[in-house]
Regions:
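N-terminal targeting sequences that direct proteins away from the cytosol to non-cytosolic compartments
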Residues: 5-60, 67, 130-132, 139-162
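Conserved polar/disulfide-associated segments of primarily extracytoplasmic proteins
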Residues: 53-144
């Protein structure tokens, strides 16, 4: 009787010890990370800018007299990828200035490159709110860029999240 009682107690102890195996099936739906909606941006466009010349879900290009303005929205996370996408250069090849603004971070940088119409000068700004990168780039011919320095500064300084 003692043996039977001992076997019964041991059986009760060891029956709950097996680890439950988790099995994933084809019908399981993957967990998708949902990003917040992109925020609204504000930029003071100059009077000589025409209506958007090209527009897509992620960006807009405006043509002005001697320069172009492009605005893009990209997923946040990889600043290196965003800077490379905007400028064609990695952040290590540029001087990227970081400024903390109330609820986002601002990155400013400048570069020049040879274009079809000669040497091009470009200034850009990327705003990072943690969910998206909002990029503004102003580019024009190096010969006439000096004439528009004040206008370009005004455009870039006005670029912010609302």
């Amino acid at each position: 009787m003692k043996k039977l009682l001992l076997l019964l107690v041991c059986g009760m102890i060891f029956t709950g010890c097996g680890a439950e195996q988790t099995v994933e099936t084809v019908a399981d739906e993957p967990v998708v990370q949902v990003l917040a909606e992109p925020r609204e941006i504000y930029v003071a466009l100059p009077d000589d800018s025409v209506l958007p010349a090209m527009e897509s879900d992620s960006g807009t290009v405006y043509f002005c007299k001697d320069y172009d303005i492009s605005i893009q929205t990209m997923e946040s996370g990889d600043l290196r990828k965003t800077v490379k996408s905007v400028s064609g250069y990695s952040p290590e090849e540029l001087t990227v200035m970081e400024t903390a603004v109330s609820d986002y971070v601002r990155y400013d940088f400048v570069w020049s490159a040879a274009g079809e119409l000669g040497q091009q000068v470009c200034r850009a700004c990327v705003l990072d709110d943690g969910n998206y990168h909002y990029a503004l780039a102003v580019m024009g011919n190096a010969d006439t860029a000096g004439e528009y320095g004040e206008i370009w500064s005004g455009i870039l300084e006005s670029f912010c999240l609302v």
